[in-house]
């Protein structure tokens, strides 16, 4: 008895060309679904990045509640974004919640262990809360990271961290390392010169100022430092030289205003 005679329906398999078309259609549908998923994921990632940037902007403006709202949303949109966690760490630091801030920095590091910017941000935080050795260690690791394009900044940051802890000899070594790496890095030159000045080493401080501005473009900080050092040395001609250049080159700077206050003292 045939299948049709027994009451069952039976269809012949589609021809080979039809089967091939079905396979192609299935593949196309699979690719379309994958592409759709990728687009949705990218949309969420883009939204997370956008809200992170907004959150940071609001935080800089001092609007902590709105910053938190944006960063909470960014986290929901992409919990695997290390930039979100770094931003939330800054938020919690501002809110006076150090445990949460530290946890967020560590989350960012777990997600991006080789990202020097993430490590640099954490190092800044560690120095600010007095964990100097940890902060300096991270700054120096960042400086050695081949992915970090400005190692002189990391060395200088390590110096600032050490200086804030009154570890001046170690700070000076880091400022010098920054200048070896980038001789025209004005911030390190200023920090080293000011460190010498505060330590009473007027000759070394003056040499630091003159060496830098003799080779590179002067900055307001270095010129004002030159004024202060020359005044301490009793060198009136040098005082007038630095002061004139500061007034002419940077008339609206905060350092020029500070110079006016010095003149009244």
Stretches found by the model and what they are:
Residues 28-50:
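Bacterial Sec signal peptide processing site at the extreme N-terminus
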Residues 39, 214-265:
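Terminal, low-structured helical/coil segments at or just beyond the last alpha-helical repeat
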Residues 43, 77, 111-112, 145-147, ...:
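Structural marker of alpha-solenoid helical repeat scaffolds
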Residues 53, 87, 121, 155-157, ...:
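Canonical tetratricopeptide repeat
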């Amino acid at each position: 008895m045939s299948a049709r005679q027994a009451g069952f329906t039976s269809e012949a398999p589609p021809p080979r060309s039809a089967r091939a078309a079905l396979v192609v259609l299935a593949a196309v549908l699979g690719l379309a679904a994958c592409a759709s998923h990728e687009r949705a994921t990218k949309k969420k990632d883009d939204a997370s990045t956008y809200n992170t940037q907004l959150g940071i902007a609001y935080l800089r403006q001092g609007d902590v509640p709105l910053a938190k709202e944006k960063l909470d949303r960014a986290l929901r949109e992409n919990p695997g974004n290390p930039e979100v966690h770094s931003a939330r760490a800054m938020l919690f630091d501002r809110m006076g919640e150090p445990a949460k801030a530290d946890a967020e920095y560590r989350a960012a590091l777990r997600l991006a262990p080789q990202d020097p910017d993430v490590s640099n941000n954490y190092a800044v935080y560690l120095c600010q809360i007095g964990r100097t050795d940890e902060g300096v260690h991270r700054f120096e690791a960042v400086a050695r990271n081949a992915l970090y394009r400005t190692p002189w900044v990391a060395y200088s940051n390590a110096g600032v961290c050490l200086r804030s802890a009154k570890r001046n000899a170690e700070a000076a070594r880091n400022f010098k390392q920054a200048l070896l790496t980038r001789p025209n890095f004005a911030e390190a030159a200023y920090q080293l010169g000011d460190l010498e000045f505060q330590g009473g080493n007027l000759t070394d401080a003056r040499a630091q100022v003159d060496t830098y501005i003799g080779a590179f473009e002067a900055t307001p900080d270095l010129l004002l430092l030159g004024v202060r050092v020359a005044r301490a040395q009793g060198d009136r001609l040098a005082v007038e030289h630095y002061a004139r250049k500061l007034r002419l080159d940077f008339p609206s700077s905060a350092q020029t205003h500070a110079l006016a206050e010095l003149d009244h003292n």
